Regions:
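Extended, low-polarity transmembrane helix blocks
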Residues: 1-28, 49-50, 54-55, 73-187
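Cytosolic, membrane-interface loops and tails of multi-pass inner-membrane proteins
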Residues: 30-46
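Alpha-helix boundary/capping detector
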Residues: 33, 46-47, 66-67, 111-112
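Short secondary-structure junction/hinge motifs that connect adjacent elements
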Residues: 35, 54-58
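A general structural signal for well-ordered alpha-helical packing
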Residues: 37, 62-66, 79-82
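Hydrophobic, membrane-inserted alpha-helices
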Residues: 58-68, 91-92
Length: 187
């Protein structure tokens, strides 16, 4: 089992790290913090919160490196799980479960991995085990804690968004904006 958890931690952790590095540094084909902030603004997050949120999302995902090494594993898992909650709520939920439709299937799997590794512990091939921290920072209640805090943290982050118009109001607002642009061009 120790080898299985090691493999899971390393693969998922390095993928999370890469995704965070895209946001923080623009590495691996990413766009960096300013473009990520712009994307968050398009998702409805207030302008003054967008850049700090982009940096926090990048740091939380960069925690994948800690997860891969099994160092401060429960804390790293909390950051990773929280980012997945926000990703589902802002981007994927409206598309349904399946990722073929842009849904949250993959995000749910990553969230579950973070919680499961926290509940089961990072395994004997981890820095936490080397330091003797496994029994103090993992277990069922730690997993439950990551589950609850990631959901609560995600809910708090969602409160930083601007109120969203219902879809029909959004369509009407876009139509009015297009009419104004057309009138301006014609004038």
């Amino acid at each position: 089992m120790a080898y299985g958890i090691l493999f899971l931690r390393v693969v998922v952790g390095l993928l999370f790290f890469g995704h965070g590095a895209q946001k923080l540094f623009g590495w691996f084909g990413g766009h960096g913090p300013r473009a990520t902030a712009g994307f968050l603004g398009q998702l409805g997050f207030r302008r003054e919160h967008a850049l700090p949120m982009a940096l926090m999302a990048g740091l939380s995902e960069a925690a994948g490196l800690l997860f891969a090494f099994g160092f401060l594993t429960s804390l790293a898992a909390l950051g990773m799980a929280s980012v997945m909650v926000v990703a589902v709520a802002t981007v994927h939920w409206r598309n349904g479960l399946w990722s073929t439709d842009g849904g949250y299937e993959f995000n749910l799997v990553l969230w579950a991995v973070a919680i499961a590794v926290t509940a089961s512990g990072p395994g004997r091939f981890s820095l936490d085990a080397l330091l003797g921290w496994v029994d103090n920072a993992s277990g069922v209640w730690w997993g439950v804690g990551v589950l609850v805090v990631s959901l609560a943290g995600g809910a708090l982050v969602m409160r930083l968004r601007e109120p969203q118009l219902p879809a029909e109001d959004t369509d009407a607002a876009l139509t009015r904006e297009q009419e104004r642009e057309t009138q301006t061009i014609v004038s």
